[in-house]
């Protein structure tokens, strides 16, 4: 159990898009101390990419790399370059929580390497490989975490957007079955220009194509909203925007509902994680959002044919900052256990 009154010591493994934004977000948390980052890239490069961000702008703090550390204003953060997490000095530095954001150590075996190194808990910034690892979306099912849980998955950015809508519809109307599509900003797991990739669609130039591909969000939703297990499938359309995405969810419901009833149920569920929006927005309007999911009430619609109804709802998310803020909420929750 982590002491409730003490400052929580955090390390970040993997200083890519998510790792750097987690760093920015955690730095402003009064009860969190970022002790170290681990990445195989040279500290000078890490410092530059932390300071300058094409999607989220310049970091308004002084950032300097010096002697295997990052100096953020006057705060020193250690920088390690270790391939094997088991060899990291987490015990020596009394690390309470590791944010595992490499995308590589997402299995129980891989994440446990941080525990072997002396960390008290690991939060994976991706879907976990095993269902034995609890998958949580803050303000949907995060209260399933208990003090004994050593490895936790904060799910994916898309699952964090989808889950609140599924939770509300399942709770209020019951979902029979459905499908979802995320229109998703391109990511580093695509090719900038046409080049080999195991997914032949992701092999095509990301910045000039609409790229149909897979998403695990529809299948993973059952880990967060158990009542929806097996009821959804889905796919992704990767599009040429830097960040900012939207989920379309199309379902058949057990109970009849109107647009107004659906919107009212979503509005009632609004929270710091789930924003209810009545404005006619576009993707650039939600870049930098701290909400994990932004419900677009103007897009709710119903189609009825021969008494059979299909319901469509939509939610926006910044696939970077929306997710990072949800992950930080999970970190803070774990810090209080």
Swiss-Prot record:
Q: Where is the active site?
A: 157
InterPro entries in the record, alphabetically?
GlycerAld/Erythrose_P_DH, GlycerAld_3-P_DH_AS, GlycerAld_3-P_DH_cat, GlycerAld_3-P_DH_NAD(P)-bd, Glyceraldehyde-3-P_DH_1, NAD(P)-bd_dom_sf
Q: Which GO terms describe its molecular function?
A: glyceraldehyde-3-phosphate dehydrogenase (NAD+) (phosphorylating) activity; NAD binding; NADP binding
The entry marks the following residues as binding NAD(+), namely 17-18, 39, 83, 125, 319
Going by the UniProt record, its keywords in alphabetical order are: Cytoplasm, Glycolysis, NAD, Nucleotide-binding, Oxidoreductase
Name under which the protein is recorded: Glyceraldehyde-3-phosphate dehydrogenase
Q: Where is this site: Activates thiol group during catalysis?
A: 184
**What is the top-level taxon of the source organism?**
Bacteria
E.C. numbers: 1.2.1.12
Which biological pathway? Carbohydrate degradation; glycolysis; pyruvate from D-glyceraldehyde 3-phosphate: step 1/5
Identify the GO cellular component terms for this protein.
cytoplasm; membrane
**Which organism's genome codes for this protein?**
Mycoplasma pneumoniae (strain ATCC 29342 / M129 / Subtype 1) (Mycoplasmoides pneumoniae)
Q: Which family does this protein fall into?
A: Belongs to the glyceraldehyde-3-phosphate dehydrogenase family.
Tell me where it resides.
Answer: Cytoplasm
The job of this chain, per UniProt, is described as: Catalyzes the oxidative phosphorylation of glyceraldehyde 3-phosphate (G3P) to 1,3-bisphosphoglycerate (BPG) using the cofactor NAD. The first reaction step involves the formation of a hemiacetal intermediate between G3P and a cysteine residue, and this hemiacetal intermediate is then oxidized to a thioester, with concomitant reduction of NAD to NADH. The reduced NADH is then exchanged with the second NAD, and the thioester is attacked by a nucleophilic inorganic phosphate to produce BPG.
Residues that hold D-glyceraldehyde 3-phosphate according to the record: 156-158, 187, 202, 215-216, 238
Top-level class of the enzyme under EC nomenclature: oxidoreductase
Entry-linked Pfam families: Gp_dh_C, Gp_dh_N
Per the UniProt record, the lineage of the source organism begins with: Bacteria, Bacillati, Mycoplasmatota, Mycoplasmoidales, Mycoplasmoidaceae
Under catalytic activity, the entry for this protein gives: D-glyceraldehyde 3-phosphate + phosphate + NAD(+) = (2R)-3-phospho-glyceroyl phosphate + NADH + H(+)
Q: How does it assemble?
A: Homotetramer.
Which GO BP terms apply?
glucose metabolic process; glycolytic process; plasminogen activation; protein localization to cell surface
């Amino acid at each position: 159990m982590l002491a409730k009154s003490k400052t929580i010591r955090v390390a970040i493994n993997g200083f890519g898009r998510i790792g750097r934004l987690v760093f920015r977000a955690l730095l402003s948390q009064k009860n969190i101390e970022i002790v170290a980052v681990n990445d195989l890239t040279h500290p000078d490069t890490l410092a530059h990419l932390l300071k300058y961000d094409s999607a989220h702008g310049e970091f308004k703090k002084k950032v300097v790399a010096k002697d295997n550390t990052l100096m953020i204003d006057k705060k020193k953060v250690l920088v390690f370059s270790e391939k094997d997490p088991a060899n990291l000095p987490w015990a020596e530095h009394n690390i309470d929580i590791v944010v595992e954001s490499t995308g590589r150590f997402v299995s129980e075996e891989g994440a446990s390497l941080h525990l072997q190194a002396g960390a008290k808990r690991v939060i994976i910034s991706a879907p976990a490989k095993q269902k034995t690892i609890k998958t949580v979306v803050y303000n949907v099912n995060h209260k399933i975490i208990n003090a004994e849980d050593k490895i936790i998955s904060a799910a994916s950015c898309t699952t964090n957007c989808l889950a609140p809508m599924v939770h509300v519809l399942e709770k209020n109307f019951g979902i029979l079955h459905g499908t979802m599509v995320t229109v998703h900003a391109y990511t580093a797991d695509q090719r900038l220009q046409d080049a080999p990739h195991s997914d032949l669609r992701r092999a095509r130039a990301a910045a000039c194509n609409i790229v149909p591909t897979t998403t695990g969000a529809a299948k993973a939703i059952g880990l967060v909203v158990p009542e929806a297990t097996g009821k959804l499938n889905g796919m992704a359309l990767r599009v040429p925007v830097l960040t900012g995405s939207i989920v379309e969810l199309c379902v058949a419901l057990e109970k009849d509902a109107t647009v107004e009833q659906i919107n009212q149920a979503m509005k009632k569920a609004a929270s710091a994680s789930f924003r209810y929006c009545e404005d006619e927005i576009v993707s650039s309007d939600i870049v930098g959002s701290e909400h994990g999911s932004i419900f677009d009430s103007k897009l709710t619609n119903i189609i009825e044919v021969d008494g059979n109804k299909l319901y469509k709802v939509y939610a926006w998310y910044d696939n970077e900052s929306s997710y990072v803020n949800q992950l930080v909420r999970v970190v803070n929750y774990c810090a209080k256990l």
